[in-house]
């Protein structure tokens, strides 16, 4: 994958050192910045890891202008069905019943742990990652993308507006609608649709979730409150067959960046 900005390199992790570099960035974003924690988080080495990392492909954006060891500025991890079989499950299955997706007969790709270094937000970094993801999707003939996406915090009262908007306007078709598991289940129908301030609710959604919705994405039933990661998760689903022609063309080009 060749970038039009020569200081950037976009590629898949190919060594344990690469994966540790991705985990370092994830630590800075998810742990140091957002307050997450987990059983395999290494605070001394500043690495955010979990048991699923060996089964994912790790898409990394590097800026070669930075010091060695600090060049990874964006990451995305993706897992196909064979990775999930090797791991024993998809990552999202801890929080959602994925039976509707797994029985669909469609080719699935789980997305997760997307993050960009603070100095690169609002620029081209996320665009590079998304274009590289598009290349991966075309190469592997992926039909459905899914994964958990997070709203920061676990105070459901503060998240009532964006969760209600997702429930009323963006539920996935029933045949492709995962349901949050009982252990952390949170009803998203918290504010009646006619009482919802839609502009404010939309503004409260994280940029990544809004981007998926613009592509035609939808959400599963219920949110999952994740206290360990200090967030409230939703399950995003994107059926590439239902994307607009404009956005499908982006994926069909399949030429990376």
Predicted feature locations:
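Long, continuous compositionally biased terminal/linker segments
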Residues: 235-257
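Extracellular structured ligand-interaction cores
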Residues: 7, 56, 73-75, 108, ...
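Short alpha-helical segments and helix-capping/turn motifs at coil-helix boundaries
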Residues: 43-46, 57-62, 220
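Conserved N-terminal entry element of GNAT/NAT acetyltransferase domains
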Residues: 1-16
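An N-terminal domain-cap segment
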Residues: 13-55
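Short, His- and charge-rich active-site/binding loops that engage polyanionic ligands
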Residues: 55-101
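Acyl-donor binding region in acyl/amide transferases
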Residues: 81-218, 223-232
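A short helix-loop-beta-strand connector motif used in the catalytic cores of GNAT acetyltransferases and
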Residues: 49-60, 86, 229-234
């Amino acid at each position: 994958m060749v970038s039009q900005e020569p200081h950037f390199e976009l590629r898949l992790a190919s060594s344990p050192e690469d994966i540790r570099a991705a985990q370092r960035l994830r630590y800075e974003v998810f742990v140091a910045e957002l307050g997450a924690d987990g059983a395999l988080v290494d605070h001394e080495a500043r690495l955010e890891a979990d048991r699923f990392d060996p089964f994912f492909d790790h898409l990394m954006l590097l800026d070669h202008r930075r010091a060695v060891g600090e060049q990874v500025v964006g990451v995305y991890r993706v897992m196909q069905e064979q990775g999930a079989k090797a791991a024993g499950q998809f990552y999202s299955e801890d929080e959602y019943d994925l039976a509707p997706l797994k029985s669909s007969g469609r080719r699935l790709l789980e997305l997760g742990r997307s993050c960009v270094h603070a100095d690169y937000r609002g620029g081209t970094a996320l665009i590079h990652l998304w274009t590289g993801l598009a290349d991966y999707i075309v190469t592997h003939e992926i039909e459905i993308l899914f994964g958990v996406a997070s709203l920061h915090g676990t105070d459901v009262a503060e998240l009532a507006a964006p969760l209600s908007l997702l429930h009323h306007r963006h539920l996935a078709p029933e045949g492709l609608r995962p349901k949050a598991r009982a252990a952390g289940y949170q009803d998203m129908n918290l504010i009646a649709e006619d009482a919802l301030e839609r502009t404010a609710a939309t503004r409260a959604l994280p940029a990544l979730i809004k981007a998926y919705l613009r592509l035609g994405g939808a959400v599963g039933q219920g949110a999952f409150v994740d206290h360990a990661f200090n967030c409230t998760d939703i399950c995003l689903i994107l059926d590439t067959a239902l994307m607009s022609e404009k956005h499908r063309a982006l994926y069909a080009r399949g030429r990376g960046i």
